[in-house]
Amino acid sequence: MSGTRKPGQRATPAATPGGMQLFDRDGSRKYLTVAERARFLRTAEQAPREARTLCMTLAWSGCRLSEALALTADRVDLAGGVLVFATLKKRQDGIYRAVPVPPSLLEALDLVHGIREAQRRRGRGSAARLWPWSRMTGWRAVHAVMVAAGLSGPAASPKGLRHAFGVAAVSSGIPLNMVQKWLGHAQLSTTAIYANAVGAEEQDIARKMW
């Protein structure tokens, strides 16, 4: 098997042992770049309130769409500055992880979903889901913002936001074991795929000088 690529073809990082790749078979990215992620968040500011907070949660926490849709008020730690997600791909139930998020996200969640009020009631609404939507409804809300932001392709999806979080974290120098914890990966080798994507991003930046 030759390592030679056709002119203009992007280098595709190797897959993890579990098969995860950040490029599809055509070499298209499955993750948003830093600029695309920022554009998505700016566009989300104009979306309906519940769609906006869902988009912000996905972008700033790196969680899976199903994990975001399972989030309840009692798992929003305003004092600690974290969101607590049930890690849905673990083999056993009851596995949670705390992910630090920006104050702006916590403020938006409180404003739109009444987090403080729900937590004060304790048991009378604090366990209700913030977004009582099906997975398809949540996906459509995110997709609508992607379209409005002019984003398309495999990266323009909730999974693309999750991958963008991983790439941004590694690019910022966050240790891989910390990124693994935040993303809820069972194996560090899965998280390590984002280091390959950083290399591809650096190549794109360098190409601007050539």
How would you name each of these model-derived features?
Residues 1-39, 86, 92:
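Flexible interdomain linker/hinge and immediately adjacent N-terminus
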Residues 1-2, 10, 34, 70-111, ...:
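Conserved tyrosine-mediated DNA breakage-rejoining catalytic core shared by Y-recombinases
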Residues 14-17, 97-100, 196-210:
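DNA/chromatin major-groove-contacting recognition/catalytic segments
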Residues 26, 90-111, 122-144:
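C-terminal catalytic core of Y-nucleophile DNA break-rejoin enzymes
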Residues 34-65, 123:
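Basic, Lys/Arg- and aromatic-enriched nucleic-acid-binding interface segment
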Residues 42-47, 120-126, 140-181:
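Short, basic (Lys/Arg/His-rich) helix/loop patches that form interaction surfaces
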Residues 58-80, 177-178:
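Short, charged phosphate-coordinating catalytic segments
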Residues 87-91, 183, 187-208:
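Catalytic-site neighborhood detector that most strongly recognizes the C-terminal catalytic loop/helix
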